[in-house]
C-alpha cells in the first residue's frame, strides 16, 4: 500500500497532504488530551504503534509503485479511535520512509490518508456499529481489523487510478486493475491480520481489562464474557 517516493505527480502529493492535515491536527489534539487525562494508556498506545510499525513493514510485491502488507491500524482504531490512530500511523510512515525506504516523504500525505485515516475510520465505524447491535466482541474486533486493512487498499487503488487513469477506460478501468492486483494478496493478509489482532485484543482484556473499560471499548459485562468464553 505504501506508494513509493516520487511516484505520484506533484499536484496529487500536495492534494493528499492538504486532505490529511486536518485529521492529523485533530488527532494530535485528542492524543494530548488523552495522555493528560490518563497516563496509564501510554503503554497501550505504544503497543498499538508497534503493531502498525511491525505489520506494515512486512511488505510483499504488488502493483508498480506500491506493495502489499498488513496495516495493523485496526487495533488502534478500536482502542483509541481513528484520529489518534492517524497520528500513530504518520509517525510510523515517516520512520519507514526515512530509514527503511518504505513509502516516501513526497507520498506521505497519500499514504497517511489511506492507511492512517481511511482504514482506521472504517474499522472504527464497523466496531461501533457492531457494538450497537450487540455483536460478539471477538467477531466485532476481527471484522473491524480485517475491513480496515482491505479498505486501506481500496483507497490506495483510488489514489493510483486518479493519478494514472488508463488510456482506454479511464479512472474506472485503472481502479479495477489496481484493486484486482491488490486483492490477490490483500484478502488473505486481511484475514490473517484480523485473527492476529483478535488474539491480541483477548490478551489485553486478560491483563488490563480496566483500560479497555475506561476507554469505552468494551463494557464490564463484555469483558467478563470474553474471559469466560475463551478461558
Swiss-Prot record:
Entry keyword set: Cell membrane, Cobalamin biosynthesis, Cobalt, Cobalt transport, Ion transport, Membrane, Transmembrane, Transmembrane helix, Transport
PANTHER family in alphabetical order: COBALT TRANSPORT PROTEIN CBIM (PTHR43627:SF1), PTHR43627
Pfam families linked: CbiM (PF01891)
Membership in a protein family: Belongs to the CbiM family.
The protein, known as: Putative cobalt transport protein CbiM 1
GO CC list: ATP-binding cassette (ABC) transporter complex
Record's bilayer topology term: Multi-pass membrane protein
InterPro entries hit by this protein: CbiM (IPR018024), CbiM/NikMN (IPR002751)
Gene Ontology molecular function: any one: cobalt ion transmembrane transporter activity
Subunit composition and interactions: Forms an energy-coupling factor (ECF) transporter complex composed of an ATP-binding protein (A component, CbiO), a transmembrane protein (T component, CbiQ) and 2 possible substrate-capture proteins (S components, CbiM and CbiN) of unknown stoichimetry.
Primary role: Part of the energy-coupling factor (ECF) transporter complex CbiMNOQ involved in cobalt import.
GO biological process terms on file: cobalamin biosynthetic process
Bilayer-spanning residue ranges: 8-28, 41-61, 74-94, 97-117, 138-158, 175-195
Principal location listed in the UniProt entry: membrane
Keyword Transmembrane applies: yes
RNA-binding listed as a keyword: no
Localisation per UniProt entry: Cell membrane
Pathway: Cofactor biosynthesis; adenosylcobalamin biosynthesis
Amino acid at each position: 500500500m505504501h506508494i513509493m517516493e516520487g511516484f505520484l505527480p506533484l499536484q496529487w502529493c500536495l492534494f493528499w497532504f492538504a486532505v490529511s492535515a486536518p485529521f492529523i491536527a485533530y488527532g494530535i489534539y485528542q492524543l494530548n488530551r488523552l495522555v493528560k487525562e490518563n497516563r496509564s494508556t501510554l503503554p497501550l498506545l505504544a503497543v498499538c504503534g508497534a503493531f502498525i510499525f511491525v505489520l506494515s513493514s512486512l511488505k510483499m510485491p504488488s502493483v508498480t509503485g506500491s506493495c502489499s502488507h498488513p496495516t495493523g491500524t485496526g487495533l488502534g482504531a478500536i482502542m483509541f479511535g481513528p484520529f489518534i490512530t492517524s497520528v500513530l500511523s504518520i509517525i510510523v510512515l515517516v520512520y519507514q520512509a526515512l530509514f527503511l525506504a518504505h513509502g516516501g516523504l513526497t507520498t506521505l500525505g497519500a499514504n497517511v490518508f489511506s492507511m492512517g485515516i481511511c482504514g482506521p475510520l472504517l474499522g472504527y465505524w464497523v466496531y461501533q456499529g457492531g457494538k450497537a447491535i450487540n455483536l460478539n466482541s471477538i467477531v466485532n474486533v476481527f471484522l473491524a481489523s480485517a475491513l480496515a486493512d482491505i479498505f486501506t487498499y481500496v483507497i490506495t487503488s483510488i489514489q493510483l487510478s486518479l493519478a494514472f487513469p488508463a488510456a482506454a477506460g479511464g479512472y474506472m478501468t485503472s481502479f479495477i486493475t489496481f484493486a484486482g492486483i491488490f486483492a490477490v494478496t490483500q484478502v488473505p493478509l486481511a484475514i490473517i491480520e484480523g485473527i492476529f489482532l483478535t488474539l491480541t485484543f483477548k490478551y489485553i482484556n486478560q491483563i488490563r481489562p480496566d483500560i479497555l473499560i475506561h476507554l469505552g471499548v468494551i463494557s464490564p459485562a463484555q469483558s467478563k464474557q470474553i474471559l469466560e468464553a475463551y478461558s
